[in-house]
Amino acid sequence: MRMLLSSLMISTGLVLAPSPADVPLRGFFPQSVQAERDLEARFKTMPDPAHMRESMRRLSARPHHVGSAYDKDNAEWLLNQFKSYGWDVHIENFDVLFPTPIERVVELVAPTTFKAALQETALPEDPTSNQQSEQLPSYNAYSIDGDVTGPLVFVNYGIPADYEELEQHGISVKGAIVIAKYGGSWRGIKPKVAAEHGAIGCLIYSDPRDDGYANGDVFPKGPMRPAQGVQRGSVADMPVYPGDPLTPGVGATKDAKRLTVAQAATITKIPVLPISYGDAQPLLAALGGPVAPAAWRGGLPITYRLGAGPARVHLRVKSDWSLKTLYDVIARLPGTTEADQWIVRGNHHDAWVNGAEDPISGLVAELEEARALGSLYKQGWRPKRTIIYAAWDGEEPGLLGSTEWAETHADELKAHAVAYLNSDGNGRGFLGVSGSHSLEKFMNGVAVDVEDPESRVSAWKRLQASRIMNGSTEVRHEARDREDLRIGALGSGSDYSSFIDHLGVASLNLGYGGEDDGGIYHSIYDDFYWFTHFSDTSFVYGRALAQTAGVAVLRLANADVLPFAFTNLAETIQTYVKDLQSLRDRRAEQITERNRQIEDGIFKAASDPRDPVTAPQRQQPAPQLNFAPLLNALDSLSHAASRYDKAYSRAVSEGRTAVAKGVNERLVQAERALTSTEGLKNRPWYVHMLYAPGFYTGYGVKTIPGVREAIEQGEWRDADREIARAAAAVEREASLVSGLATTLTGGS
């Protein structure tokens, strides 16, 4: 039925999409357009699904985590591949803190006893699942060592709102070990919030309702997580800073000055360990106390209770805290007329175990792009701008390789980097794009020119159809009526973070997915067998990713005038500001209503006497906030962006080569204008005023983060100050864009 409706909308013309011929090639003079179109047509025929399949088979053949023999072996193989494609390539090394487990114990000691297996089961159908001697055991990297015993408390997803719920039930986690479900936030938030509330240890498990049998057959019969499957992952406090915990802000070179482990701000305060739902079930079943709220209950065949106790758990974690060597593979095609401007493209090569989906499915697409670009280069094509392709090491533990490289080359990147294009895992489904909104119009143009391999419509048209069919009323109307499909904002979670969040380099994150859900994330089952049975089995979406990212790289590298557009940026910021105003009003209303309920004794009167709820603390009323500076700055940017768009269109259509170089040099700095050298409160590594990972969400983005988090946390004095700081960044952007418009119209 769903497929039928999609076909109907497309065939009857209700889903309107531009054809490639209808979309101007943004950034190219009329005399350059046909050559670029011809080049892209040649490029798009080159990425080969068969090559991707064999590259994945080779790269995912053995576990290749940081510090492993196969991690280095893969880096050297990648080096040789780039060389064979005609690229200038080298390996850049960094020495980083990467703890690996020595001891792991989880056991129920009361009221009954049970010892968790902490072992994923090898499966006869899956030929690489039995490489136990090379596999990293299931653990959470950067958990502090510890040996603790205490009562167990179930905390749902372990986010701040869950602790508010527990407090109303009169349940404290002080001196307890908490058990939290994966999901609801990035995993590193769970031990962070638990420690803030006095917990002494943290267990994290994947509930079958989220990615197990409640969603389909489990592996190997189906794609979902089996009972002993465990999600490994880092719990370093990356919202403070990513990368090597011992060298914040500087590259982790051999001679770098390092903090001690005790000084590192991103290492957890309590021991943490991930477990399977098979190991979690006896622990949860032993809990007493109130029945968990309906929204907290998972898919296990037990009564979910909160605790604390009578279950008591013993948790022991001990790791090897030595430095390990990273192997970043850096390849370069030199530019010609604007060689000092760089287009950077990256995907990581390390994995928690075999990592076929994460990250090799994205890496093999990047390799095919590099092979195709190298072939064009050998045939005589030369890019205007220098193209850099990177295969990062150490992404999984904490964006290590990309962060250390970006910090080491920070001054060069600030001077030369036009844009960074990232990918990670890739699968079947719809095109996903997030990134700098000055590149939103540009990426819409790219998406129109790439065909979805299964539906045979453009990637743009298929994404539009999905939003019309599945979106809210607002999303549906906008997908039909807005000229460009919206792209998302970037928080953290992959290798773009250092570029956009720390250096202010315009960035994009690209990938396909949404139609190949699974439950093998960060487990031993993320391997070639799983991917070739349950994901992009024919690798045609790998080809689509290579075409999408490769065309974007070609256009950025070859454009006569860089294809940034600022009207979309201004309009997006306007939606952020409106949302902030609504957030302030909602918070004020919530506080007023909550305080009234406390004063009127509502909590006590409505509470079940047999399961009483404790009234929360009264909060200070929310003051009005002065958004005027931000609104005024936004008006300035909107006006400047409109002027720029008109001047840009005219200058490009007239082929005004005389102004191109000067404009391009200033466009490189456009994203930098949105940063502040002071950085965000309590985390100065993050300098972008529009985008950052949430302090209590992790990967998830907070837009205009200084203001948003001040409102969310009730820090009202900070809110007005952060509004002024955000306004100053938008004013800087407006001034830069206005100056560019003047130059394009013939001014100085």
What name fits each language-model region?
Residues 653-748:
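C-terminal amphipathic alpha-helical interaction region
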Residues 113, 143, 226-291, 338, ...:
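Metal-dependent peptidase/peptidase-like ectodomains
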Residues 152-224, 336-340, 352, 367, ...:
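A conserved hydrophobic secondary-structure block that centers on an alpha-helix together
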Residues 208, 329, 345-399, 404, ...:
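Alpha-helical metal-binding/catalytic segments enriched in His/Glu/Asp
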Residues 388, 449, 501, 516-575, ...:
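His/Asp/Glu-rich mid-to-C-terminal helical/loop segments that flank catalytic regions of hydrolases
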